[in-house]
Amino acid sequence: MGIELVCLFLLLLGRNDHVQGGCAWGGAESCSDCLLTGPHCAWCSQENFTHLSGAGERCDTPANLLAKGCQLPFIENPVSRIEVLQNKPLSVGRQKNSSDIVQIAPQSLVLKLRPGREQTLQVQVRQTEDYPVDLYYLMDLSASMDDDLNTIKELGSRLAKEMSKLTSNFRLGFGSFVEKPVSPFMKTTPEEITNPCSSIPYFCLPTFGFKHILPLTDDAERFNEIVRKQKISANIDTPEGGFDAIMQAAVCKEKIGWRNDSLHLLVFVSDADSHFGMDSKLAGIVIPNDGLCHLDHRNEYSMSTVLEYPTIGQLIDKLVQNNVLLIFAVTQEQVHLYENYAKLIPGATVGLLQKDSGNILQLIISAYEELRSEVELEVLGDTEGLNLSFTALCNNGVLFPHQKKCSHMKVGDTASFNVTVSVSNCEKRSRNLIIKPVGLGDTLEILVSAECDCDCQREIETNSSKCHNGNGSFQCGVCTCNPGHMGPHCECGEDMVSTDSCKESPGHPSCSGRGDCYCGQCICHLSPYGSIYGPYCQCDNFSCLRHKGLLCGDNGDCDCGECVCRDGWTGEYCNCTTNRDSCTSEDGVLCSGRGDCVCGKCVCRNPGASGPTCERCPTCGDPCNSKRSCIECYLSADGQAQEECADKCKAIGATISEEDFSKDTSVSCSLQGENECLITFLITTDNEGKTIIHNINEKDCPKPPNIPMIMLGVSLAILLIGVVLLCIWKLLVSFHDRKEVAKFEAERSKAKWQTGTNPLYRGSTSTFKNVTYKHREKHKAGLSSDG
């Protein structure tokens, strides 16, 4: 046994040899603290193993401890392990006694886990042949299911006959449901309470929640007889109280007659959705469902009007707890809803039911065969803080990671599952887990505990002479000092030496938290990343900035948190070279005069400039014309505009100098200015590659125009043009008048007038004759003659 342990330990050494740093860096002061530092850390309990640097050096990987001189028997490195308590072989073939059937292996084990380390165990499941079956038929007896009730009156005999081909031990039972008998789920008039179908008119039973009618029995004729006696009921809303019925059928184990060693099938038949959860608050029912059996002496659900409908989560818990497999037989309109429910409920299946339940027998047989062709594991118990993962190995030999289900299995085939378990921290308490196949009563019980203790902790020497005159207890190779004493061997008294001398300033941790105060002096911890040093362990050579993952860009040394760059390098993390060779263009100009050399690379300044040395610049133009804006601003600016001109020149990468430079190294330029002057200047480049403009001159400038004379000439020209136009107008008018007069004279000389009366003339005297006057004279003459 000892040789086997040594071989196992050496194997672990080889596996963990690559793990570096994390253990020693943790600063563990005891064996238990070391085990918590990491899953690959080990503790050396060998006496006098460390020097004054303290106990932290004892915690490291096993390989590093061996390299430091720790002997193998003194290395504490607990590993995760499995202790199998019970492992009966899986049953093969038919078993006479159902209590002897074993369908899962192993059956019981203890799992001790090192925090952070995984442990894998294998679970095997094999469904035995001729396994007993209990089938409970739960039917919706609302008015819409009347034709279905007539169809299943002979179902018992036919179902028993078909199931006898699959198992020799078959029992079936019957129950029914409608709805909670309370408003608003039913009408509450006296007539409707007595006969909910009175408005049709038709006689039906009063609304009820759930009735358990026939316990599980092998008498198929008894089932038929019970079904024939059933009558429908009615309610108002479309959803039914089916989930109330499922809950009672699952938890009322004794009354239903569920056997321990059998397959429990619950066939749920309905043509409507089901209420769940808080739907019952519409009826003022607010007490949550308690998940207990509430069948009275008449086998009716007595708490239908008191407790809420169960939630989906409550149904799942109780169905799994009682190993009940649910078969939803529902009509076309409801299939989608119940498929969603089945996805949440382990082992549940959905079948399409015809309008009159004509296919119920085929549906049940198909669902049974589907359930027997699948093996799925479920985990019960306290899993909080545990990491569990599954890998399925089905009968085709293919691995399915992260899957705990095998499909298309045959009865008698073996399904294997690799279960990987780990814990993340140490827990004093143990926990119990149960792994079981869905729908089967066989279980694997697992007791899980954390392995966080070292063997050396069982032995302790109080007031040991190894701890300087008995000033501490010796355990696992280190001294735990009594109050008032300190130091690796408890050789210093706290009243003699103050830890303030190990603090850089008041309020700072002792030895910067990276060392131990040993009798007034800091002994810095060892670090896998480098050295920790300084009177207060405040410095190290590994905490500087990194460039591309390299400390100080690999171009300098880290000293107390700052990079000290080597020759030819600069910058905060020594990533910037001072060499300008790569910035010099072919003509020897730094960045072609169009940029600045930054860290050995050209940063092009001119718009459009590109290339390693800014040599490409299609938009830069000729060097003379590109300086036009700078030159013209300089020539036209007064004292106040000099800053604006300096900005314009800076924008094109140039400066203007009054000094004279060598004409041999300068480029001569000439431009035509806005004022028609010829501007001449020279361009040169200094040692830094910057453009310098000098020797700026203006020549051949035209004289400015005589503005007063121009204005006088223009005015006289305008006046002269006006006079000429006026004369021309006068000549044209005179010519036209003369022409008209001559024409008139010619026409007058040709005219010959005749003597006669002007038809338009009227005389000055007019004679008017009064006709009335003549008659009046005649009348007077007549009167005279009569007289």
Curated annotation (Swiss-Prot):
Q: Which Gene3D superfamilies match?
A: 4.10.1240.30, Cytochrome c1, transmembrane anchor, C-terminal, Laminin, ligand-binding face of the semaphorins, domain 2, ntegrin, alpha v. Chain A, domain 3, von Willebrand factor, type A domain
- Positions of the VWFA domain: 131-371
Glycosylation positions in this chain: N48, N97, N260, N387, N418, N463, N471, N541, N575
Mapped to this chain, the residue ranges on the Cytoplasmic side of the membrane are 730-787
Q: What is the lineage of its organism?
A: Eukaryota, Metazoa, Chordata, Craniata, Vertebrata
What family is reported? Belongs to the integrin beta chain family.
* Domain PSI: start-end pairs: 22-71
Q: Which residues of this UniProt protein bind Ca(2+) 2?
A: E179, N235, D237, P239, E240
Chief location: membrane
GO BP terms, alphabetized: bone development; bronchiole development; cell adhesion mediated by integrin; cell morphogenesis; cell-matrix adhesion; cellular response to ionizing radiation; enamel mineralization; gene expression
Per the UniProt record, the source organism is Mus musculus
The residues covered by the I-EGF domain are 456-491, 492-538, 539-575, 576-615
| Subunit (UniProt) | Heterodimer of an alpha and a beta subunit. Interacts with FLNB. Interacts with HAX1. ITGAV:ITGB6 interacts with FBN1. ITGAV:ITGB6 interacts with TGFB1.
Kindly indicate where the leader peptide sits in this chain.
Answer: 1-21
Identify this protein by name: Integrin beta-6
